[in-house]
Amino acid sequence: MSVLPQAGWMQREGLAELVVALGADHMRWVGGCVRDTLLALDVHDVDCATIHLPNEVIRRCKDAGIKVVPTGIDHGTVTAVFKGGPVEITTLRQDVATDGRRATVAFASDWKDDAARRDFTINALYAHPETSEIDDYFGGLDDLDARTVRFIGDARQRIKEDHLRILRYFRFQARFGAEWDDEAVTACEELSATLKGLSRERVAMELLAICALPDPYAAFERMRELGVLAVILPETTPAQMTALQGLIAAEAAQGFAPDPIRRLAALLPPLAPVAETVAVRLRLSRAQRARLMTAAERMGEDAENPQALAYKYKNESAIDRLLMAGADAQLLKGWEAPRFPLKGGAIVARGVGAGPEVARIMREIEARWVSEGFPDEARVLQMLDDALS
């Protein structure tokens, strides 16, 4: 019998009280917290499954003084709120009907039935909260040891139940996988067109999640070869794959964390209108759209003056453009753009009438100020006097 090692997350405030409230024999830690503990990775999200129906979970939590929120009660999920972080509690379920986008579920009482509706074997590991014994119904432990991402049961059937599992497969493969599972790859290729039926928001969420991984290049390249990427991001060509590879290397070499919007920009041609089209299609936020468009334009400016670039585009976008050009962006770490010290009143005080001429002079002096490396106010006033002399 395999046992879950002790880990820091198990000592989070409130978890012991939750186990008492639900009953240790009536709940199991499940999913990512079990998987990542076995891999000695940091655990962020804690989930548990229980035989109790949602209303019973709510009653037990309230009786124990635990704040609980019915976040997805129709699907059997409520969230217990603790200072150490929330815990999602889901009643055992089995699928009654699926249409590739959402499932109709019925509550169950069998742990294996609940495990059977999950996507991958490595995500269907259940751990007893007191004994730490692991229940593994589909060979997830062996797959975890082999770093194999494998669908539970028939891969095609799992994908037909939820088409988003195609993208989830590549995300988990990029994060955990070593060797590719032939059955999974074939199923993803054959059913790739089903991604067209998903909401744009769900596609965007998974796409950006893949982009945020330390090195998603191999996963994206396999997606491109199989035609999966062409369904959700047809703008990507081999040239863009090369750009992504270069960006990943530049981020690593210069100590920048992976950034999903920057990575997405690398997958697009260097054209702002194309980036805008993609942003609209994926329903990105306005801020994400603006940043994607700026990054996609690539470098047109001199990379020798990164601070000038940051003054024009803000730090984040300047870093994007520099890294995508393979240029040094480290100077911008923690850098804050200074405020332009010249006011219109100083120009008017020197005899220039208020109006467009003042604005023109302001722009001229500001450009010189930036090119000289943002000197102090005294130097700016000297520039002004020189310009008016």
Briefly describe each language-model feature range.
Residues 1-389:
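Catalytic cores of the polymerase beta-like nucleotidyltransferase superfamily
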